[in-house]
Curated annotation (Swiss-Prot):
Changing residue 260 to Q: In plasmid pINV_F6_M1382. Keywords: Hydrolase, Plasmid, Secreted, Virulence. Converts phosphatidylinositol 4,5-bisphosphate (PtdIns 4,5-P2) to PtdIns 5-P. IpgD is injected by Shigella into the host cell and is required for invasion. The accumulation of PtdIns 5-P causes membrane ruffling and actin cytoskeleton rearrangements at the entry site. Acts in concert with IpaA to coordinate and control the membrane and cytoskeletal rearrangements induced early after invasion of the host cell. This is Inositol phosphate phosphatase IpgD. The active site is at residue 439. Changing residue 304 to E: In plasmid pINV_F6_M1382. Changing residue 107 to D: In plasmid pINV_F6_M1382. InterPro entries: IpgD/SopB (IPR008108).
Amino acid sequence: MHITNLGLHQVSFQSGDSYKGAEETGKHKGVSVISYQRVKNGERNKGIEALNRLYLQNQTSLTGKSLLFARDKAEVFCEAIKLAGGDTSKIKAMMERLDTYKLGEVNKRHINELNKVISEEIRAQLGIKNKKELQTKIKQIFTDYLNNKNWGPVNKNISHHGKNYSFQLTPASHMKIGNKNIFVKEYNGKGICCASTRERDHIANMWLSKVVDDEGKEIFSGIRHGVISAYGLKKNSSERAVAARNKAEELVSAALYSRPELLSQALSGKTVDLKIVSTSLLTPTSLTGGEESMLKDQVSALKGLNSKRGGPTKLLIRNSDGLLKEVSVNLKVVTFNFGVNELALKMGLGWRNVDKLNDESICSLLGDNFLKNGVIGGWAAEAIEKNPPCKNDVIYLANQIKEIVNNKLQKNDNGEPYKLSQRVTLLAYTIGAVPCWNCKSGKDRTGMQDAEIKREIIRKHETGQFSQLNSKLSSEEKRLFSTILMNSGNMEIQEMNTGVPGNKVMKKLPLSSLELSYSERIGDPKIWNMVKGYSSFV
C-alpha cells in the first residue's frame, strides 16, 4: 500500500486563495477548481509555488482519504482470511460496488458499511466470539502486515537560498556493516511498526536521522525511535523489564553505529567513550494511555546501561562477517522528558513526575550550579575543552536552556511547543554526544521534533546563529518549515507505521485555546491539512 500521492487532479481553494498562473477549469460559488495537470508557473514567490504544487499533488477530501484507506485495509484483511482458508466473497463484492462510484458519490455511510462487512467476516470466518477478541485480531492482522513489509532507507532533498540539503533516514533494518545487520536479533530487512506493543527484542520504529549539506558534510545526526517499553506486556513484570533492557541495548548499539569511527575502534577491541542524551516527549500521567509507566521502563533500562566505575558496558555487535563480537563502551547516558502535547502544554499535566529527572540531567549536561550562576560545567565544559570552536554555540544554547528552565517556559506552548526538547537535542549534538529522541510511537511527536531540528539546523547553517528564544517564525521561515514538514521523510515513516501518512500532532479541538500553535508556525492552512494527512483515520 502506498498512497502518499493520491493522484486526484482537481482541488478546491476558497476564492482569493487560488494558485496564480493556473488555469481555472470550472466555477463554483466561492470556489476556484484548478486542474493540477494544467498548473503553470505563475509570477509568485517560488517557495509559495512549490508549496502549492505539493498541495495539489497530495490534498484530497477527507471522504476520499478514508475510502482509500478503508479499501486498502480491506485488501489486507481479505488476504488474512484467505490464508486461514476462509471466504472473502462478501468483502470483495462490497469493494467492487464501491469501485463503481465516483469519489464525490462516496460518503461516510459507504465506508462504514465496508468496515462493518470486514469486521463481520473476520468474526465469522475466523471463529471469533466477542468484540474485544475481534479488535485484537484486527489489530494483529494489520500489524503483521506492516511488519512484514520491507523498510528501506528514506532520502529526501530540499533547496533553500540556492543551497541543497539532504535528509537521510536509515531504519534499524539497514544499520549494517557491509551486508550484515549490526544487532543481536536480525531484522531481515523488515520493520517493527509502532503497534508492536509486545515486541521483546527490537525498538519500534527506530531510525538514524541525518542532515547533510550540499558539500556532502553531515550537519546533524541523531536517533529517533518509539518508546523503550513493551507496554503491551504486564506492567512491572520481569518479561517487560527484560524487553526494555533489550531495547535499550539496541538503542546504544544504534548510537554507536551513528559514529562510524567509534564503531570501528570498538570492533577492533578498543574501549570507546560514548555519550547519549535521551530526550523523551511523553506526558507521564495516568490520563495518557500508560505513558508514566512507559517512561519508567525507558529511564530504568537506559540508566541500567551506564558504565559503572568497575568497568565499561559490554555490548554484542555483529561485524562485517555477521559474527557477534563483544565490544566495550565507556557509556554515559542522561535522560530527559519534556511533554509537548496539549495535556502538558495547555493543562500542565505530567511535569510533577519529571522535574527531578530533568534537573538531574541538566546537572550532568551543564554542571551542578549552571542554573543558579550560569557557570558551564559537566559534559558541556568537557566538550569546550576538547573542541574550543564549539564554545560559542554551546554557550548560546546553554543560556537559552537556562532561561527556559528557570522561567518554566517549557511547560507552556507560547508559540514554540518543542522549545526545550529541540535545544537540548541540538546541544547534545554540538558537544559530541549522540542525541536520541522519542515519543510513544516514534512517528508523531517524534516526527515533529525531527522537523523542528531540521528547520533550525538549516537556519544555523545559513546564518551562523541559532534562533533567539521567543522569536516568531518569519514568513520565509514558515515556508522553509512547511517544505521540511512535507519533505523531511516523516510522511514515509508514518506510512510505514500505520499504512498511511499523517501526523496526529495536527488537531482541531472544540476549544481552540487548547490547540497547539502549529497553525501559526506553519502559516498556511493547506499545508497544515497536508501534514495532518490521514492521521484521524488511524
